[in-house]
Amino acid sequence: MFDSDHNSIFQSDLCQRLVVHSILLTFLVILLCTSLYPSSAFIVGLLSSACAALGTYEMGAMVRIKFPFSFTRYSALGSAIFIALTCLTARCKMCFPEHIDLLPWFFLFFWTIRLVFKSRHYKLGPIGSTGLALFCMLYVSVPIRLFLHILYGFVHTDTPFVGIWWAIFLIATTKSSDIFGYFFGKAFGKKRIAPVISPNKTVVGFIAGCCGSILVSLLFYSHLPKAFADQIAVPWILIALGTVLGVSGFFGDIIESTFKRDAQIKNSSDLESIGGMLDVLDSLLLSTPIVYAILLITQNRTFLG
């Protein structure tokens, strides 16, 4: 009886996840494929800012459970403006003076300085409040900033769609690790990797997640447009990158699970079939900087990091 109820709950949850994530991914791919157009770039900036604000707010809410932190909304607003400026400077970098990409960092610096004076009369004081707010903002916003630079890092070249290819590749390989790990871990996983931090993470799920990332990497290479084939890494590099993204996505999930366990919550929020924005972004928060660094190293002649 218990097994039957457990299976029905699992199947119901699985169907909800499949439907919601399929709709979200379809919309995201369409948006990214058209992200070079001004109207779509505006939507990308708007959604990226919203994701940064919501993710930062959720992180601040977890911090507030442990500490008397009073600047959750302030941090979320700072992240939103930081990412909006990033999207503007990344997409239109060629239209602005050199080093315009420093503008978001100048904003963040003065936003933090303002917080120092705002937090003088609060319990945590300037050091505690500023440190926690800065962590909440940077933990979520920096990976999103790097993602936008990947997306728009080739707009100055004859093949600006290379950035779109890398952005979709990053999401597909990382999320395939999540999907394969979830399915195979639920179906066949027995030995848990970190039972205290994340009870659902199993050895089978971890291996399946890495295999899923590698498989998607190979699929992407097999459908590589010839127009910019010389600007994409060779197959063995993509296979290695798929493995690295599978591992990094796993640990990104583990890191967020560590925060949630410390705050004694199950999900970062209560969004239906998603959990929370951090639950969606967790694996990408660690894999995005890796892809960005690899592009800086391998595509340094064409990639505007």
UniProtKB/Swiss-Prot annotation:
Pfam families: CTP_transf_1
Keyword terms, alphabetized: Cell membrane, Lipid biosynthesis, Lipid metabolism, Membrane, Nucleotidyltransferase, Phospholipid biosynthesis, Phospholipid metabolism, Transferase, Transmembrane, Transmembrane helix
Entry similarity comment: Belongs to the CDS family.
Origin superkingdom: Bacteria
Protein name: Phosphatidate cytidylyltransferase
Transmembrane spans: 27-47, 67-87, 96-116, 124-144, 150-170, 202-222, 232-252, 277-297
Highest classification ranks of the organism: Bacteria, Pseudomonadati, Chlamydiota, Chlamydiia, Chlamydiales
Cellular compartments per GO CC: plasma membrane
Protein location: Cell membrane
A single BP term in Gene Ontology: CDP-diacylglycerol biosynthetic process
EC nos: 2.7.7.41
Catalysed reaction, written as an equation: a 1,2-diacyl-sn-glycero-3-phosphate + CTP + H(+) = a CDP-1,2-diacyl-sn-glycerol + diphosphate
Record-level Gene Ontology MF annotations: phosphatidate cytidylyltransferase activity
The protein's enzyme class: transferase
Membrane topology classification: Multi-pass membrane protein
Pathway named in the protein's UniProt entry: Phospholipid metabolism; CDP-diacylglycerol biosynthesis; CDP-diacylglycerol from sn-glycerol 3-phosphate: step 3/3
